[in-house]
């Protein structure tokens, strides 16, 4: 195990009440849990997301922190947040990267492998490393 390592768990959900399928609007929430499974305290600085719909449209989203925060995680600490995205189709995917800096100055990326956004079956937990 690397001394610089975060584990990422994702739980996507379709939000029917905020969606308008007949107008091509499908809204999803996703809860992300980030756990520092390394041996060094590290801070999440920024994120990059690639959001893809079933028509091949890709939106790249970059920003500082997550939900307005840049959590500092000691070994064993976890941070959980919920955010959302909109698609033009009932299915799509997301994947991304968290850029992190450890307390010793080491910079590292934590990949968030692709997860599925599906208006019919969103809600199954996925553990991603």
Could you tell me what each predicted segment is?
Residues 59-91:
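Intrinsically disordered, low-complexity Pro/Gly/Ser/Thr-rich segments with frequent PxxP/GP/PP motifs
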Residues 34-38:
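Asparagine-centered strand-capping/turn motif at beta-strand->loop junctions
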Residues 25-31:
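Short, solvent-exposed loop/turn segments enriched in Ser/Thr/Gly
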Residues 86-129:
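Terminal connector regions
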Residues 6, 42, 59, 106-110:
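Short beta-strand segments
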Residues 1-25:
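Low-complexity, acidic Ser/Thr/Pro/Gly-rich terminal tails and inter-domain linkers that flank the onset
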Residues 53-56, 68-78, 117-127:
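Short, surface-exposed linear segments at secondary-structure transitions and domain or protein termini
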């Amino acid at each position: 195990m690397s001394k610089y390592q975060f584990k990422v768990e994702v739980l996507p959900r379709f939000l029917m009440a905020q969606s308008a399928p007949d107008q091509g609007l499908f809204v999803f929430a996703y809860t992300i849990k980030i756990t520092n499974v390394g041996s060094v305290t590290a801070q999440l600085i920024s994120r990059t997301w690639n959001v893809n719909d079933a028509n091949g449209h890709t939106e790249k989203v970059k920003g500082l922190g997550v939900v307005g925060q840049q959590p500092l995680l000691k070994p064993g600490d976890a941070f959980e947040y919920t955010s959302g995205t909109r698609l033009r189709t009932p299915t799509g995917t997301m994947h991304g990267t968290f850029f992190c800096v450890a307390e010793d100055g080491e910079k590292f990326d934590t990949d968030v492998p692709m997860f599925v956004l599906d208006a019919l079956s969103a809600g199954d937990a996925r553990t991603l490393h």
